[in-house]
Amino acid sequence: MSEYDEIFDVVDSEDMVIGKASRLQVHNNDLMHRSVHILVFNSTGSLFLQKRAMIKDESPGLWDSSAAGHVESGEDYISCAKRELNEELSLSDVQLDEVLFIPAQSTTFWEHVRVYKCVTDSNICINKNEISEGRYMKLSEVRALMQLNPEIHTSTFSLIYANYINKLG
């Protein structure tokens, strides 16, 4: 099954399920749906960022959260976050804490976004089908990049940065 065959729950502005549609239908018709973003910190407080693969249908080649993905139909947010961490970074058995909810809007491609964070020093092995590269950055480096080159980041990551990351010490 290709990613275009994936089925997502279509939701309303209150994040209540009102139907189902394929990934292609959801994106082509700006239907509200769900996604997760995960911020992976190491024990020194650095944040792992990924650069999205050029083959991605949304924001190819841009820097993004450590891991991210769509919530599949019938799946809950936390299960999706665990699945995406494993699929994209080969991480499992980490404690995930929800830190932010962003309501669906054009900037998020009509996705309600739940943001989770975890702290781990486990080895990260990126999935080259999803991610072209990734690395840990000090928060001061993330801030500098966001100020100098905000266009190299996804629009959703920019919202996460403004509403959560930039408020960290």
Named regions from a protein language model:
Residues 35-67:
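A glycine-rich, hydrophobic loop/mini-helix early in the fold
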